[in-house]
Design a protein with these regions (language model features):
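Single-stranded nucleic acid-binding surfaces, predominantly the OB-fold ssDNA-binding core
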Residues: 1-115
Length: 115
């Protein structure tokens, strides 16, 4: 079991078009939101859908793949690790972010033509 200390596996649907940027040193980074939905019972015992949203981060060549092939609605399987960071807003408020830095990705609805 390699690297299970900080390991995340998700299957879900892309919730928005990926955002692709370039860092100051020229490295590409892509982010997107992935929705995972599971069935749960509410207080009355009725089965309902519960959706969680996850922010995914892709670096380098993976960011290129995301930019060219991933669109809203695409079904993906990913494996990665959790990353926590914080920043301070212009108004001085501290914000915390949890993201999944993706190591591996698979297209589950088949790969599409380049955008």
């Amino acid at each position: 079991m390699k690297n299970i200390m900080n390991s995340v596996r998700l299957i879900g649907n892309v919730g928005r078009e990926p955002q692709v940027k370039e860092t100051a040193n020229g490295t590409k980074v892509a982010t997107l939101s992935l929705a995972t939905t599971e069935k749960r019972r509410d207080a009355a015992g009725k089965l309902i859908d519960h959706t969680d949203w996850h922010t995914l981060v892709f670096w380098g060549k993976q960011a290129d793949v995301v930019a060219n092939y991933v669109s809203k609605g695409e079904k993906l399987a990913i494996e990665g690790k959790l990353s926590h960071r914080d920043y301070t807003t212009k108004t001085g408020e501290k914000r915390y972010i949890t993201e999944v830095v993706v190591n591996e990705m698979a297209f589950l609805n088949g790969r599409k033509a380049e955008k």
